Structure formats: C-alpha cells, structure tokens
Amino acid sequence: MKQAWNGWLLALQLFTTIPIRRSIAWNAAHVRWLVRCMPLAGALIGALSAGVYALFSTFSFSSPLVWALLLLWLGIWMAGGMHADGFMDVSDAFFSYRDVKRRQEIMSDPRVGAFAVLSLICLLSFRWLFLYESLQTGIPPALFAAVPLLSRAGAAWLLSVGKLAKPTGMAASLREYSSWRDAIWALGLAFVLLSLLCASTAISVQTGAALAAAAVVLAAAAKPWAEKQFGGITGDVLGALIEGGETVLWGVIWLLHSSVMG
C-alpha cells in the first residue's frame, strides 16, 4: 500500500503541477505504480476542471466562449505544459521530412521551430472550438474527467507495447521498471472509473463507449506511426498522443452532442 501511495504521489509530481512537497525515490516499485496511476492523474486534472466548470456555470454572466478558453488553459497549466511541449517537439520533427535519425535529433533539440508553434496553435484552436460548441449544448462536467483519463490510459498502453526509439529519455526511464502488466493495471483502473461515471449517469453509456473506442483507435494507430516516423516511442511521442488525443476526444464529444441537439 505504501508503494502504491508513493507511486501515486510520484505520478502527481511528474505529470501535474499539484505541489507535492515530498522526496520520493525513483525505484522499480514506485515507477510501476506511477505508470499504473497515469490515467488517474489525468482524471484528477479533469476533475478539477469539472469542478470549476460546475461551480461557475451556474452564474448568469458565464459565457461559453470565455469558459472554453479558461478551461482549455486550466487543463494545460495543471499538466505543467509537459505534454504540449512533447507535441511541439514531435511536430517539429515530423514536418522536417528528414530521416529517422535526424528527426530524433530534432526532438532532442530544446529550440522551438515554426512548425511546432503553428501545430500547437492549430491543435489548441480546434480544441477550443470543440469545447466552445460542446459547452453550449450543456455537457455534463464529468466529461472533463473522462477525456484526460482515457488519453493517458492510451499513453500507458503505448509505453508498454511500443518499441523504444532510444535507450535514454523519459519513455526509457519509465519502461526500465515497468511492463505490460502495469499497462493492464492502468487500463483496468481507467475502465473501472469510466464504468462508474457511466453507472452513475454522469456520462451516458453511449458517450463513454464512443470515447473509449476513439481512445483505443488513437493509441493503436500511434504505435506503427511512431515506429515508422521516429524509430519508436519517446516521452515526446507519449505527450503528443495525450495532447492530440484530448483534442480528438473533445471532437468526438462535440459530434455526439451536436447530432443529438440537431
């Protein structure tokens, strides 16, 4: 139990800006639980956003346009911008149209290129649009927890099954002490939490199933794509999957609710 708790705290330290003032050893037991808790860390970020949305959406002066922007940036800030940085690095490398070795070098370069900036603007613009349109339909706050829950569950799976692009870096550090069993744990925890949200009617079963299916397709497609384009997975690739996945999942929510409203 202590190892699980330390792994949970380590996940919060690494993947969120929640202040955990405690030194936790980076060892096999803690890292295994860190990987298992990745979806839960995402769900916590989403739950905080859901709480903010539920609290302030009751005010008559609330505007979907403003709230879409605030909730968008709240989610990115709570994740420390870590995954957005990975998305930018992957975009720079992919749009360089160079060979695999050069793309790996570009992802390791701390400098930011034009394609990274343009790609992030495009990504966040579409997410803001999907959020704005969805908020106007009166979506349940629980969806803010479901989206980051599923995006990080997909990243945990990709971490366990994908070929490593290099023996160093964040993905290699996590993979050193974890295995596919830990990914099964992560997927199981995500499934249980999503099922509870559906059972409590916080999210409809149809919406939950559609989001889960979309997350599965994204993670499954990311594996061969990353191995072809970058020689395997890296921490940046995992971050790109999380950020890109959240935008796609919000697009699915928008399509589902716009079709119902229509």
Curated annotation (Swiss-Prot):
Q: Where in the cell is it found?
A: Cell membrane
What processes in GO biological process is this protein linked to?
A: cobalamin biosynthetic process
Q: In which pathway does it act?
A: Cofactor biosynthesis; adenosylcobalamin biosynthesis; adenosylcobalamin from cob(II)yrinate a,c-diamide: step 7/7
Broadest EC class assigned to this enzyme: transferase
Q: How does it sit in the membrane?
A: Multi-pass membrane protein
From the Swiss-Prot or TrEMBL record, what is one GO molecular function term? cobalamin 5'-phosphate synthase activity
Catalysis: reaction(s): alpha-ribazole + adenosylcob(III)inamide-GDP = adenosylcob(III)alamin + GMP + H(+); alpha-ribazole 5'-phosphate + adenosylcob(III)inamide-GDP = adenosylcob(III)alamin 5'-phosphate + GMP + H(+)
Q: What is its EC number?
A: 2.7.8.26
GO cellular component entries: plasma membrane
**Entry keyword Nuclease:** no
Role: Joins adenosylcobinamide-GDP and alpha-ribazole to generate adenosylcobalamin (Ado-cobalamin). Also synthesizes adenosylcobalamin 5'-phosphate from adenosylcobinamide-GDP and alpha-ribazole 5'-phosphate.
Q: Which HAMAP family match?
A: CobS
The identity of this protein, by name, is Adenosylcobinamide-GDP ribazoletransferase
